[in-house]
């Protein structure tokens, strides 16, 4: 067996938005001579489509819900506690399994939502690095909230002017979000004791916020974690995310349809793998987009929320509704004019990295703050204004926002800014770029001497 420079065990939080970026980081490490093993819970392993040719090894661990996953847990706190109990035991089993091999595990890269993994790393004498899947700005606000025992004072010094509506939702928790709020705060309980802090961003994008975080502890930005083919092309065969929780049959249909559309003419609408819009909000979107050519991804579980008879009225020559789309292929297609997004960090990074202006419709978690930066800091889009009482964005506001991004007074500026961020993303990952330097620093310090 080939002796590698070291062996990194990557332990993501078990949801697709956390699994994907840490897996992409594994590909970068593998390209630099490291063996990488990526853990997946048994339930997720049994439900994903995994590329068998991937160079990344997979090890299964347990969250205590091997047959039903998160949805079979009685509550969020129950799931998190059982994941800690069963996860720490089964991750330890993975480490022991490799101890006497030619490539024993030397480092754990773990999701920042799992601070218990640091204790596990120390128990086995391993290098440890939490992986923060959100932006430097969001991480800094969450850190301040933790430092101040869950409270924040606005405005926040050294950050753009933030209003309550711009803050991550877990910073102002409701009873239903309390477990998530505690999970967000727990990221910072022991992170200063780790050997490295890894953040899925790139220096040029939020260098000021990176500097603020670095005053607390040293930070290495190692993003964007978008497949190399779309950016720097340094990692061979890194053409896509190579795992997905959804059926891939519609990919060819999607690409074929986009090929038939004029350049920059299509509004791409997608709200990620978890966001659940109300029926009222789905109706407002449906009524707002009738004058546009659009590709709208509506998960099968959300279809019942569409207005009665709406699907029958869609002009199939001009528009397309699918349950799933190959998002990177879509965003990189010349037919796409803008991206209407929930502003999850992965989707936001994809939009920025592929140079696509955005219509921001944040739902929860870090998304409101990402939307703030999309509009006011990176200047690549517009945030759709929702009504204060209902929280619903009305059809007129949605239609106006799409028009502004597609053809409004600032449309040209937004497109130019989007292209600028795309170029900077490519530069950061290319040889000698900020992210490339940071990854090289990381691997030089964890390699076996």
Residues covered by each model-derived region:
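Glycosyltransferase specificity loop/lid
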Residues: 1-449
